[in-house]
Amino acid sequence: MPTSHGERSCTRYKLKKTVRERGLSPISKAIQDFEEGQMVHIDIDPSVQKGMPNAKFQGKTGKVLGKRGRAYLLQVTDGNSKKEVISLSQHLKPQKY
C-alpha cells in the first residue's frame, strides 16, 4: 500500500496526549491573548483540529506579528528561512523569561 501524504501523516507520537491530558483542554487556553511582538511556543493541542499549524512546527518558538480573525500570525524560523504560520491560541503557549 502506498504511503499517505495527508496533513497528519507521520504524527503518531507528535500529536498524542498523555493519559493525564486526555479529553478537552481548559477554556482558558482558548481565551488567552497575546500582544504583537510577544514570543510564543507552538504546542499543538490534538483535541482542537481548527487552526492547527503544520506538525513540523511543533515545539518551535515564534514571534506574534498580528491577528487574522481569531487566529494569530506568527513568524517562525525554519532553518535559515523565516516562515509565517497561522494558528489559534489553543496551540500556543507564552514564553516565560
Swiss-Prot record:
Gene Ontology molecular function: structural constituent of ribosome
UniProt KW keywords: Ribonucleoprotein, Ribosomal protein
Lineage top rank: taxon: Archaea
This protein's record includes keyword Ribonucleoprotein: yes
Ranges that cross the membrane: none
Presence of the UniProt keyword Nucleotide-binding in the record: no
Any one cellular-component term (Gene Ontology): ribosome
BP GO annotations: translation
Similarity comment: Belongs to the eukaryotic ribosomal protein eL21 family.
HAMAP family: Ribosomal_eL21
NCBIfam families per UniProt: PRK04306.1
Annotated protein name in UniProt: Large ribosomal subunit protein eL21
